[in-house]
Amino acid sequence: MIKKGKNEKIEKKKNLPVGIDNFEVMIQNNYYYFDKTGLIEEILESGTTRILFTRPRRFGKSLNMSMLKYFFDVKNKDENKKLFENLEISKSEYFDRQGQNPVIFISFKDFEETNWENGFNSIKEEIKSLYNEFRFLREKLEKSDLMDFDNIWLKKKEGNYSRALSNLSRYLFEYYGKKVVLLIDEYDKPIIKAHANGYYNNVINFFKTFFEKAVKGNDYAEIKVITGILRIAKEGIFSGLNNLEVHTILEKKI
């Protein structure tokens, strides 16, 4: 055992982040973190507003999306700022963008359903949980918007789930006066499961409208980032999104 002098600091050994995809947990618990915060600068510098990252499983997609959430989110921005101290983005001219936007973050990575009835219920549950996070908006909503919000929040059959993200973007813009950063993680997990279990057309029909409204027709979202495994050419759910930037693992930038 090597003894240190009394004035020498003993560096605490960092833990390996096995299965950790929450950026805050990663930083606060001293896990070993390979600094990917330069991605934030690349996104902002590129001026691209719609980005699809395609990577294999276990390639850190969800952790990067969590990082983006903690960087941009206007909620708890002062506490979140501390997470980025001494990381690459803290030295960037774009660091002043930290904590400047409401953030919508939804993930389908845990989707495992084997039929459409359960699959649609799982999707609704994910959207309901998202709305629950923003239930404070209810105090400021007009009557018709409040009804639409509650139909989703209470998971009623009348809920307009295909427009849930686009409507929530508008509610947040009207509340904060700032455009949203929209993050959709593992967009294709339901598609892959549906293809393997015989309800592919049901999922595609739902997500065509879901993504068209959330990504293409959403003027209340400033930046939209999507992750998955499948390339866009394999699915028709993003048809019409002419300026969607697709970035694969083989590309250096972004």
Model-predicted regions and their roles:
Residues 1-254:
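Phosphate-binding site recognition
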